[in-house]
Amino acid sequence: MTWPHFEQLAFPDLSRHSSHSTTRGVPSVPMDLSSFSDMLRRQAPHLLPFRGDASLTPTDAVPHGTTIVALKFPGGVVMAGDRRATQGNMIASRDVQKVYITDDYTATGIAGTAAIAVEFARLYAVELEHYEKLEGVALTFAGKVNRLATMVRGNLGAALQGFVALPLLAGFDLDDPDPQAAGRIVSFDAAGGHNLEEEGFQSVGSGSIFAKSSMKKLYHQVTDADSALRVAVEALYDAADDDSATGGPDLVRGIFPTAVLITADGAEEVTQERIAGLAREVIQNRSRADTFGPDAHAPRGTDS
């Protein structure tokens, strides 16, 4: 995570012997030391992604990230995202990273106000690592969901002002007795509510309606990690085809979606070479160059 102003964080004295003890002038208050975001909220709120400045108003000048998709397959889950960020009707960036590995068995995709969403993902990764270091054990998947929901809820004030940032969480539940069904996808609303997806796929962002429609039609083809990754690429291609804020594969610049595969072996980023190959296959299969389209000329000698 990026620390714009590095300074020593003051921890309150939690000693039971004195209710008035202080550390660097900070009064003793109850605090969940295993929560990194809670520590920042109490000790250094200026380091949080959003501080609830009521003077801020929504504006198209703020970059927004767009479409994220996730699909379960037997033995795991895949998450993928496009690379475009927009400012109103302008393209702000063509190579934004929107899918982040947050620990060994989870990944987070971001959509919405880019600055807040990116800090969500980074802070969440620190949150999980901080808990594991203090407690000596990793959070359960349910615990990871609750931690992220709390962070999203903390951004409600900004969301009500128009600065919405919504994550999509994918992971592998180590406590599931059936490893083939241990893939998990969780979506969130702006108030911190969360939903465990049972249909096997989900999408967030401006192109989500088109991506979900694509996955609904193609999900029956998912049998393993390779087929799930292909369907994810196709869904993002369909979203980019109808949503101007979602970027499709850019063959000229060599920019392609990013993706993460999560299985019992852990989370790993999919190589750009692998995704580029799938993207080219999708484009080739959908090309009309060798088919009779509306502008194709009928063969000579045939009746019109």
Curated annotation (Swiss-Prot):
Biological process according to GO: modification-dependent protein catabolic process; proteasomal protein catabolic process
Keywords tagged on the record: Autocatalytic cleavage, Cytoplasm, Hydrolase, Protease, Proteasome, Threonine protease, Zymogen
CDD domains per the UniProt record, alphabetical: proteasome_protease_HslV (cd01906)
Main location: cytoplasm
Subcellular location: Cytoplasm
Catalytic residue list: 66 (nucleophile)
Protein name listed in UniProt: Proteasome subunit beta
UniProt organism field: Mycobacterium sp. (strain KMS)
Record lineage: Bacteria, Bacillati, Actinomycetota, Actinomycetes, Mycobacteriales
